[in-house]
Amino acid sequence: MASNSTKSFLADAGYGEQELDANSALMELDKGLRSGKLGEQCEAVVRFPRLFQKYPFPILINSAFLKLADVFRVGNNFLRLCVLKVTQQSEKHLEKILNVDEFVKRVFSVIHSNDPVARAITLRMLGSLASIIPERKNAHHSIRQSLDSHDNVEVEAAVFAAANFSAQSKDFAVGICNKISEMIQGLATPVDLKLKLIPILQHMHHDALLASSARQLLQQLVTSYPSTKMVIVSLHTFTLLAASSLVDTPKQIQLLLQYLKNDPRKAVKRLAVQDLKLLASKTPHTWSKENIQALCECALHTPYDSLKLGMLSVLSTLSGTIAIKHYFSVVPGNVGSSPRSSDLVKLAQECCYHSNRGIAAHGVRVLTNITVSCQEKDLLSLEQDAVFGLESLLVLCSQDDSPGAQSTVKSALSCMVKLAKGRPHLSRSVVDTLLTQLHSSQDAARILMCHCLAAIAMQLPVLGDGMLGDLVELYKVIGRSATDKQQELLVSLATVIFVASQKALSAEVKAVIKQQLESVSSGWTVYRIARQASRMGNHDMARELYQSLLTQVASEHFYFWLNSLKEFSHAEQCLTGLQEDSFSSALSCIAESLKFYHKGIASLTAASTPLNPLSFQCEFVKLRIDLLQAFSQLICTCNSLKTSPPPAIATTIAMTLGNDLQRCGRISNQMKQSMEEFRSLASRYRDLYQASFDADSATLRNVELQQQSCLLIAHAIEALVLDPESASFQEYGSTGAAHADSEYERRMMSVYSRVLEEVESLNRKYAPVSYMHTACLCNAIIALLKVPLSFQRYFFQKLQSTSIKLALSPSPRSPAEPIAVQNNQQLALKVEGVVQHGSKPGLFRRVQSVCLNVSSTLQSKSGQDYKIPIDSMTNEMEQRVEPHNDYFSTQFLLNFAVLGTHSITVESSVRDANGIVWKTGPRTTMFVKSLEDPYSQQIRLQQQAQQPLQPQPLPQPQPRSAYTRF
């Protein structure tokens, strides 16, 4: 239990381990490089990639690569080969080499060796460095020269280097194109070398003229050399060139279709299908109706199942893109083909019941995509064909436990989810099929079916009640063994039951689940089911499961983690007893919930570690506590209208002060404070949202809903009590119409709509403030709290991990020591950074750019005390940089005209591909001491020395008056 649970909330937390600093680690490796033993030298060389991963900043990487270049220069060929492998593994760090000239100079010196193997390794080394030296003419010359070598190893290395430089340098590509053409067409060039030279032409895409000349050469090769190997290599290079240059892609599709149709060789047909699949995924918009029709005809007439499978794979890829709309579109002047009578539909219908399950899977995928994409009224037969095809495929493959069958089941189930979402009237038959098949399928297929049922029930909650009975009956009979598949099935089936139960679980369902878990389940399975219960809002079930796990963990931190989850579930369970119009019991329920929340936050704090501080979880729970306290305070404020109504002279006071709110008495000030508190909570929820770059979309939506709840109550207070005249309901009107992806979101949206309607109705009918207004506010709070809170995935699991590491230069010797700068000079602050990822980078969103904000403030002032312009005391600058290979760097010029100590704060935030800014941090601070420049100091000292010599002015006599003596 302890080892497995580490995956959930301690994943990817490996950036804080205490190890050697960068210089010490480099010195250790340098000691190995200087060893006289070849084994120790090789061991030191191969450990460099790990060093680059831990300390990815240019100063260390530059020093390390210079040492490796020395080893490459003076070592033997085996050491050179090791250095080459390290360079290729560390490709993303090459641009951090500062002394590129010196590095290349040491490597390039080996090119003049008499040993052809040494020259070959050097050429491969230069090819691996092409990204940082694309325009080095000496490297270009050496590659051209080595292509004419009589040593095969050197020529192959030159071909490798030529391919890499062609991809990076336009000048090299233009210069080498003719030479490659001559070598390919030359009679003296061996065939195997020609086959290696042809792929270089795929990089000739730097401009249209170069791409056109490469296409002409490839066209000649395809025609002149009809052997199978030459045709395959030339056609594939042709395709890659077309995909990269985006020139003549339709012509390439036609050429591939021509070879697919006319060439009798099976290998060529297979290559044509693979390349068509590549172009279908990269450029589906370039496919014409005629291209798809030709591919359908080939698939209908081919006798080979393997080729038919490949062609259907291309068609299934195209059917999910814009190409399918082009195929069925009606051109003006022509009669468009009906989807029911087209060759594509005919082919898909034929293949739906094919004995080859791969062909059948692609056939039903094509039918599903056509059914969902073509929104026509007369597609009833196609819909039925798609449903029947999916049913037969599911029956065929769900009994088979092989990986191929499970892949087919997964494909069929994804089509079912898509069909249920696009055509909701088919969802009932899809669900019935799945429930029927669940009883007789293999465990692996059952797990996938449960995921499919959960996805459909989330989209269409009305189907949940109908499937609940069958699911509970199935839950009673599974789990007879403790195998991994059975444990996974227990979790998946419990998840579907939670989704299908729109409200609280019945006692019978709870008893069935607990009985199964007590018999064969492991602690990890129980934890996963409890986690799903917390996510779906079944907090009473979750509390019991967490309670049962407390004695099964071996770590103190895990114990506190489970205990905190138990307390949070208990706290949310206390809120299920809320009743509308019962305000006193609502206060007691909230107080009871807060008691358990405070216990839980104490346990959660104890569960955190330096490597995993649980910052999101702690902040989310603190906000929930503050929100409950704000709700409680608002209910007390509303109740105070009964215990402390406005005085009789309240209207007179309001008219005297010119403040109409004073008519309501002291409740008006309390309401104003409550509104500000809810707006403050909404702002804090927004900050939590912006700090959660690695969270999944469901978690972010959950945080957003909490923020909207705060804004809703603040708006209701303003509209009902504080400012009913100017309250606007326009911006809140569309809240309920938004598409909801979960039952929790759907219920919250329903509450928002109902509360807004009641507030708007009261706002129009009655003047503030009456018991109806306060009752409306209290009922709004109760309605929000009656929806069980959902603890989403990011609360338990961190699937994506992204962090930024900053390095500032110049850097002080110690963090508290300031850097000295003269006040008449500017400080050039260089900010370097590395974006570090966990095991799944970019799973939810990627870093597009990094925003760096640099600000400075005057901490302590030295020198004369006179008024200083505010602009001279502070610096405020911002830059946006795009990381390249996860590295970025920029500079700021800062002015410190005022003498004294200044603090510089550098804060980073992240901008994703959608332009959203995320406040990920980190925040780094350093100190600068602004010193007076020597010339100004000398002049000031001279002026101070001259001041005592000047006569002091006599004081002016004060005029006497009657008040002087007093």
From Swiss-Prot:
Originating species: Mus musculus
Keyword Transcription regulation belongs to the record: no
Family: Belongs to the Integrator subunit 7 family.
Location(s), subcellular: Nucleus; Chromosome; Cytoplasm
Annotated spans, Disordered: 941-966
Pfam families: INTS7_C, INTS7_HB, INTS7_N
Name under which the protein is recorded: Integrator complex subunit 7
Role of this protein: Component of the integrator complex, a multiprotein complex that terminates RNA polymerase II (Pol II) transcription in the promoter-proximal region of genes.
Primary location recorded for the protein, binned into one broad class: nucleus
SUPFAM superfamilies hit by this protein: ARM repeat
Gene Ontology CC: one annotated term: cytoplasm
Gene name, Swiss-Prot/TrEMBL: Ints7
